[in-house]
Amino acid sequence: MKKNKLAFVDVETTGIDHEKYEIIELGCILVEQNWDAAGQPEFKVLDEFEFKIKPERIEQADKVSLKINGYNEPDWLEALSLPDAMRIFADKTEDAIMVAHNVAFDFCFLAKAFSLTGVTNKMHYHKLDTISIAFAKLHLKEGVDRFSLQFLCDHFGIENKKAHTALSDCRATLELYKKLMQI
């Protein structure tokens, strides 16, 4: 039986450009994926966590982005510094394959954060993107004309109660991944 450790990751940010904006929330669910003798996937959640991260340049934030992800100063008073968050994240995700919905977006922000803090990224170099997997499996399916996390959650009947919060989006991405692996 082949085992893989997967890190379902989501970042919430102060804008969409990783060169200009910063991470304000980081969520992760660590999962062991096994394949049984019949080739069916099995999933075991090992850990899950979410950090609010103190923004250093909140005055430069995109107001629309802050509204979407629900940023408000009082909720971030006890937030971690970026270096502290990245150290914990790196230790917890060691050797895990990163999985995200639009993995390039999340990884660009993480790579910048690792660089800024001097923390070493310990994740496996392979990454999985649920948008790419969904496109490969569903692009010819009638009625599937978008690949946003919300659209695909609706399509598969996955509830995402707190969309655009890091841990909730991680949970939705994990459930989406499970559905896609069944196809």
Labelled PLM ranges:
Residues 16-18, 135, 175:
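Conserved protein kinase catalytic core
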Residues 154-155, 161, 167, 171-183:
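Acidic two-metal-ion nuclease catalytic site recognized across multiple nuclease folds
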Residues 142-152:
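A structural motif
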Residues 2-109, 124, 150-158, 164:
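Conserved non-catalytic scaffold segment of RNase H-like nuclease domains
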Residues 128-143:
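Short alpha-helix plus adjacent loop in nuclease-associated cores
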